[in-house]
Amino acid sequence: MIRVASYNIRKAIGTDRARRPERTLEVLNELDADVIALQEADRRFGGRASALPLKLIAEHSDYKPVPFDARPASLGWHGNALLVRKHVEVLEHHLFHLPSLEPRGAVLADVALGGARLRVVGMHLDLSGLWRRRQAQAILAHLKERDGDWPCVLMGDLNEWSTRGGCLRDFAAGHLFAPCGRSFHASRPITQLDQIMVSPDLEILRSGAHASPIARRASDHLPVWADLRIGDARAELPRPHPRLRTRLRHSLERGARRALNLDR
């Protein structure tokens, strides 16, 4: 089993408006995940310093940051960061720009976990619905261009208030959504802005929003999590011919569009 999580930490500023990175780290330790995607992990101005001191992470958790090295003092890229367990091997990592009116990006890492290779993408999408869809399409296009067809997890704050429309339509064409539940506002959750989406070769065992007393105070978002298992078919069956994979993908996309009533 693999546990993944996503958390918009709001630069370690809680609902009490106090910046307490040690409180944020306590929530991360509560999650007990193998991989965590963070949003708003860096300060907004100046050198974009990490909101979580690297020494604090190293000394008081079992996590290490994926070394994107975007800026010397930053934890991630445009506020997006990935944390993995210290024993997890990071095989590759990559960052990329997203189309937007203000600087936005996404981060990607391939990790060795659970005896398999897992691809993880972290994101924080725009407040504008138009730009959210463009960013979702850019992420999906980037994944198609990458080498390797590994089990994939996409996580982040999508800023999507719709339960079925908007950028969710784009991601639904080839991914399954973990039913994590409402994550915003942390003090009284009314909607699920934070999503975990997985490729069909991953089985979602359990999922939820982590609503411990400290998590309700540490940020304006609750972290979301999912327990996953790589499907048996993925492990046992030979990889299909590329043409067959294309046909299967197109079939999945048509089925997802029909399910969401997206055919025009």
PLM feature spans:
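Glycine-rich loop at the start of a catalytic domain that most often binds anionic cofactors/ligands
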Residues: S50-A51, L82
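Active-site neighborhood of divalent metal-dependent phosphoester/pyrophosphate hydrolases
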Residues: A12, Q39-G46
